[in-house]
Amino acid sequence: MLTAQITVEIQGDTHPEAVEAALQGVREAGGTLGRVRAPRLTVNMPASVAAEPVTSAQTVIVPHSVRAGFRGEYRGSVVVLGDVNPGAELIAAGDVIVAGALRGVVHAGYGGTHPDPIVWARPIASAQIRIGDAVARAPEGSSNMRRTDRTERAERAYLQDGMIVIDVQ
């Protein structure tokens, strides 16, 4: 007997009667419909691409979240299509853009060659961010343990008069 909300995944074109039959089966088992969505897609990066060194100041796209222990150095900017979890570190000569929550340590503008580097994430919940030579630390207990809600607005960190400023987008 189901006692929880159920997520139904539908792949491709599906006949409405098939959807109704699935919903009826969930109801008959005592469950309730939580949501209907397409299946989640996992994108695996080929080992040859992951090991390929970046030789120019290009933007690198990381197609997944990064976990604790990951350390990435980039000659240009980096875009992470996921979260940067606590214990992960990103160092970029350019900008650091995170499509999800930023809880790891980042350094944008490393080396001082990129004009006006930024850190952008939804939200910035990191214990420490660095932009150029400036360092910002979160107050004790307010950083990566903060619960993040997917509805949180994006935040942008940038340098202003040599200090890191974070504003809500």
UniProtKB/Swiss-Prot annotation:
The keyword Nucleus does not apply. It holds the Pfam family MinC_C. Keywords: Cell cycle, Cell division, Septation. The keyword Cell cycle applies. GO terms for biological process: cell morphogenesis; division septum assembly; regulation of cell septum assembly. InterPro entries: CAP/MinC_C (IPR016098), MinC (IPR013033), MinC_C_sf (IPR036145), Septum_form_inhib_MinC_C (IPR005526). Interacts with MinD and FtsZ. Cell division inhibitor that blocks the formation of polar Z ring septums. Rapidly oscillates between the poles of the cell to destabilize FtsZ filaments that have formed before they mature into polar Z rings. Prevents FtsZ polymerization. Belongs to the MinC family. PANTHER family: SEPTUM SITE-DETERMINING PROTEIN MINC. This is Probable septum site-determining protein MinC.
